[in-house]
């Protein structure tokens, strides 16, 4: 039986973590699949790590792995850190704030099995996908950014910046060893490099919902950094 490792980066997710963990565990147990969750916490001051330790008591330390870091060191490096401890055949990355609902996990897994895909992406921009909780400006920026990146880089996928994905573990290990970007460009570079390797990619339409608790911000610096990143990836 294949095993699935979920990498869950956290920062101030005390309120969300118990619910998202319950739903992930419930989904895998209903599908009769072997699983683990690797929680990578960046020194959250709100008690996220204490909540994670309580979850270990409930589900077991073999199911909930807490691998904290000393501070906010970036999303990309969080995945790299968490991957060191993942023991699954497949690795799933997703957000802990309910932007990505665990109900889609069976669809990811089914699609991967049917086509033996190296990567399965959750896409907001294919048929039946969508974004909820964002204002029109942010929707426009996100959609435009994805169209720009997919056109310029020729990725062949509809959502290059989403962070709800399933990977064959060796594939992710290869990509992580090569990626150099940080921030919003990180996910995009992963896909660009995947295409260089001719890895196969499938897509599952998802409804992306803005975070349940806490704040989500997108500033001009993020936008400018993204544009710079798109064109820098032309030369990888």
From Swiss-Prot:
Q: Which GO terms describe its molecular function?
A: dolichyl-phosphate beta-D-mannosyltransferase activity; metal ion binding
Ligand binding (GDP-alpha-D-mannose): 9, 11, 13, 40, 42, 95-97, 124, 160, 211, 217
A single GO BP term for this record reads: protein O-linked mannosylation
Q: State how the cofactor is bound.
A: Binds 1 divalent metal cation.
Cofactor(s) of this protein: Mg(2+); Mn(2+); Ca(2+)
Protein's cellular compartments: Endoplasmic reticulum
Question: Which positions in this protein are listed as binding Mn(2+)?
Answer: 97
Look up keyword DNA-binding and say if it applies. Answer: no
EC numbers: 2.4.1.83
Coarse class of the primary localization is: endoplasmic reticulum
Does the record bear Ribonucleoprotein in its keywords?
Answer: no
- List S-S links within the chain: none
**What pathway, per the record?**
Protein modification; protein glycosylation
Keywords of this protein's UniProt record, alphabetized?
Endoplasmic reticulum, Glycosyltransferase, Magnesium, Manganese, Metal-binding, Transferase
GO cellular component terms, A-Z: cytoplasm; dolichol-phosphate-mannose synthase complex; endoplasmic reticulum; endoplasmic reticulum membrane
To which protein family does this belong? Belongs to the glycosyltransferase 2 family.
Q: Quaternary state and partners of this protein?
A: Component of the dolichol-phosphate mannose (DPM) synthase complex composed of dpm1, dpm2 and dpm3.
Primary role:
Transfers mannose from GDP-mannose to dolichol monophosphate to form dolichol phosphate mannose (Dol-P-Man) which is the mannosyl donor in pathways leading to N-glycosylation, glycosyl phosphatidylinositol membrane anchoring, and O-mannosylation of proteins.
Q: What is this protein called?
A: Dolichol-phosphate mannosyltransferase
- Naturally occurring in which organism (per UniProt): Schizosaccharomyces pombe (strain 972 / ATCC 24843) (Fission yeast)
Q: What is the lineage of its organism?
A: Eukaryota, Fungi, Dikarya, Ascomycota, Taphrinomycotina
């Amino acid at each position: 039986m294949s095993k699935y490792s979920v990498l869950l980066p956290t920062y101030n997710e005390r309120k969300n973590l118990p619910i998202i963990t319950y739903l992930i565990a419930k989904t895998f147990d209903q599908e009769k699949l072997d699983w683990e969750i690797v929680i990578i916490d960046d020194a959250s001051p709100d008690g996220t790590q204490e909540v994670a330790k309580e979850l270990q008591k409930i589900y077991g330390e073999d199911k909930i792995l807490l691998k904290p870091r000393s501070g906010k060191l970036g999303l990309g490096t969080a995945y790299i850190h968490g991957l060191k401890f993942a023991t699954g055949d497949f690795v799933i990355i997703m957000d802990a704030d309910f932007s990505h609902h665990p109900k889609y996990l069976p669809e990811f897994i089914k699609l991967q099995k049917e086509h033996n895909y190296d990567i399965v992406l959750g896409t907001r921009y294919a048929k039946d996908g969508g974004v909820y909780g964002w204002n029109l400006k942010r929707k426009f920026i996100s959609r435009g950014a994805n169209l720009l990146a997919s056109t310029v880089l020729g990725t062949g996928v509809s959502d290059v910046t989403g962070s709800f994905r399933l990977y064959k573990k060796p594939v992710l290990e290869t990509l992580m060893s090569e990626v150099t970007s940080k921030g919003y460009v990180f996910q995009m570079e992963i896909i660009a490099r995947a295409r260089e390797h001719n890895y196969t990619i499938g897509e599952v339409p998802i409804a992306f919902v803005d975070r349940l608790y806490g704040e989500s911000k997108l500033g001009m610096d993020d936008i400018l950094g993204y544009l710079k990143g798109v064109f820098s990836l032309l030369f990888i």
